[in-house]
Design a protein with these regions (language model features):
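Conserved H-loop
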Residues: 189-195
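ABC ATPase nucleotide-binding domain signature region
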Residues: 30-34, 39-107
Length: 236
């Protein structure tokens, strides 16, 4: 971990973690910080995601805001999957139901309270567009679908959000919009961890790059050191 991060508040920490291909993994991410984690040999990313989604570590700790994560469904952690407009939107549900899907830990009556739902439409209508709340999911544009997924996570209000290769298959205009959506998390103090095999587009927002090889942290680069990355670094 870089020296400058030690005095700051940790939003997310992994301490001495062993699980699957992960060996003595130590990672710290500060509130409002964007970190790219690159799996250089493509053997750790799957185990890392399984750990966040459904499995407990063999040993070691995972902490959010200094408190241990004991339940894999802990809403303090959010995951934006690879190709989220295909994998994270429920076609059979309304736009508003999709938007509110991760909010029940904050508002227990979100599914039944017209007042809560009306206030969400009022507050986010200007940001998302008033018309989207009345559209069928299949009629949304790609940009509107990205807005839906990322705003759902914003409403969840996690301490950290993990984004799996967020720019994959996105055209140029959508990539720039994804940057804007990620910046919303950062401005709110939410830590962003981009999980990547290749680095195309990912470093534009990053404060640090953590490279993992053989399941352990191999190198850490601060933003000012990105120019020192090896010439054989996989970018595309």
């Amino acid at each position: 971990v870089s020296e400058e991060s030690k005095g700051e508040k940790a939003a997310f920490e992994i301490k001495s973690l062993y699980h699957g291909n992960l060996r003595n993994l130590n990672v710290r991410v500060n509130a409002g910080e964007c970190v790219v984690v690159q799996d250089t040999d493509n053997c750790a990313l799957r185990d890392f995601l399984l750990l966040l989604r459904e499995e407990k570590p063999r040993s070691g700790q995972i902490l959010v805001g200094g408190r241990a994560v004991k339940n894999v469904r802990d809403r303090r952690i959010a995951i934006i999957q690879e190709l989220p407009v295909e994998t994270m939107i429920f076609q059979s549900m309304s736009y508003l139901d999709n938007l509110c899907f991760n909010m029940d830990h904050r508002f227990k009556k979100v599914w039944f309270s017209k007042g809560i739902r009306k206030s969400i439409v009022s507050e986010y209508g200007a940001l998302l567009g008033e018309d989207v709340f009345y559209k069928r999911i299949g009629d949304l544009t790609t940009r509107q679908k990205y807005d839906l997924v990322y705003t759902r996570i914003l409403l969840q209000n996690p301490g950290v959000v993990f984004c799996v290769q967020p720019f994959k298959k996105a055209d140029v205009s959508i990539r720039s919009h994804i940057w804007e959506l990620l910046e919303r998390f950062l401005k709110k103090g939410i830590a962003v961890v981009i999980l990547a095999v290749n680095l195309a587009d990912s470093l534009a927002l990053a404060d640090r790059l953590i490279r993992i090889q053989d399941g352990s942290v191999q190198e850490i680069y601060n933003k000012e050191d990105f120019v020192k990355l090896p010439i054989n670094t996989p970018w595309l």
